[in-house]
Amino acid sequence: MKEQDILENQNWLEVWHHYYDPELELEPNDPNAICISSVDSTGMPNGRYVLLKDVSEKGFLFYTNLKSQKGKELFVAGKGALTWWSRAQNKSVRVQGTVEQVRDDIADTYWASRKEDAKISAILSKQSDEVASREQLEEEFAKLKAEYAGKDIPRPKHWSGV
């Protein structure tokens, strides 16, 4: 695809894949890292990095703690933005749009694919809150790991896809 063809293309998904797909082969370190931007109640913008998990005609999908500052801001505003940068291609893509939470069955399916430690970390994480100490966090982690040993770990309702 020539640069002019890309700029004139009305199919956003085709344009996305034109840049994103080669990056999966070219960049060994988190080629799916995206910066999600939201605004707080005063209109101050906030950006943070998350890992993109899927792209389809429905949009871009990542998972997060809905009680985090990011989750709250995205849903209060009902819209957000993402920026993705390709180191290998020296290109960036900006996207703006509305925000929706995925259905529970979609979040549950992805949750089931996660490793046990990642699930426990998601349960423990109180994003945007200060942690008393690393030792306390490690103790709580060990306690939950023992509690869930050999059991299914349920997805917390505040953890979902956006």
Region locations from a protein language model:
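Binding-site signature for planar aromatic cofactors or substrates
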Residues: 1-162
